[in-house]
Amino acid sequence: MRYRILAPLVSLGAALALLAAAPVAQAAATDQLQSFVTSVKTARGEFTQQQMKGKGADLKVASTSSGTFVFSRPGKFAWRYTKPYEQLLQADGQVLYIYDKDLNQVTERKLDGALGSSPAAILFGSNDLSKNFDVKNGATRDGVEWLELTPKEKDTQFERIGIGFKGGNLEAMELRDAFGNTTILTFSAIQKNPSLPADAFRFTVPKGADVMKQ
C-alpha cells in the first residue's frame, strides 16, 4: 500500500524526567523536542521519504518519494506526495481523508483512531507525547541529536520511532515497523507557526471519485 508510512495515521512531556540522568547532548535533544511539540502550533515544509532494505551496514535505499506538508495542532494536516505519484492524506481535526489520484478513490476514517502511537501523533497531534510513547536516549550523528520513541501499545504498526533535531529544527525521523522495515523521513524548508487560512484543511471530494468509509 503506497501510503503505508503514515496510514493508518494514519506526544514527550514526561521525558523531561530523563534530563537529570541524560548526557548534555541528549538533554539538548529532549529540550528541542519539547519545544517543538509545545511551541510549534502550525508549520509547513517539504519532506523526502526513503524506504530502506537490508540491515545495519547493508541498509540501502529501495525507493524514494517526496512532497509537502502543512499542519495545525491538534489533528489538522495535509501530507501531500508529489513524486513519483500524487497522493494526499488530509485531516480536518475529525476525519482523515486518503486520496489516491490514480485510482480516483477517497478513503475516510475517524481521526482519533487513526493517530494513536503513529509518527503522525508526534507531528500533528497534541503535545501529550508521554501518553503514547516511552523515551530512550539516542546518539548524536552528523550533528543531529536523536531520541528514540517506543509506542506503549504493543499492537501498533511501528515498533520504534527515532526523531532528530539540529539547532532547534526538526531534521528527520526514522521509522521501524513490526516487520523490521525501515523508513527515513527528512524535512526541509520548514516554516514555523505560519498564518493559515480558515479553510486550509477542508477536504473536497474530487469529481467522480469513489468514497469508502472505514
Swiss-Prot record:
Belongs to the LolA family. It holds the Pfam family LolA. One of its GO terms (cellular component) is periplasmic space. Its main location: periplasm. Monomer. Participates in the translocation of lipoproteins from the inner membrane to the outer membrane. Only forms a complex with a lipoprotein if the residue after the N-terminal Cys is not an aspartate (The Asp acts as a targeting signal to indicate that the lipoprotein should stay in the inner membrane). This is Outer-membrane lipoprotein carrier protein. The keyword Cytoplasm does not apply. It is found in: Periplasm. It comes from Cupriavidus metallidurans (strain ATCC 43123 / DSM 2839 / NBRC 102507 / CH34) (Ralstonia metallidurans). GO terms for biological process: lipoprotein localization to outer membrane; lipoprotein transport. Disulfide bonds: none annotated. Keywords: Chaperone, Periplasm, Protein transport, Signal, Transport.
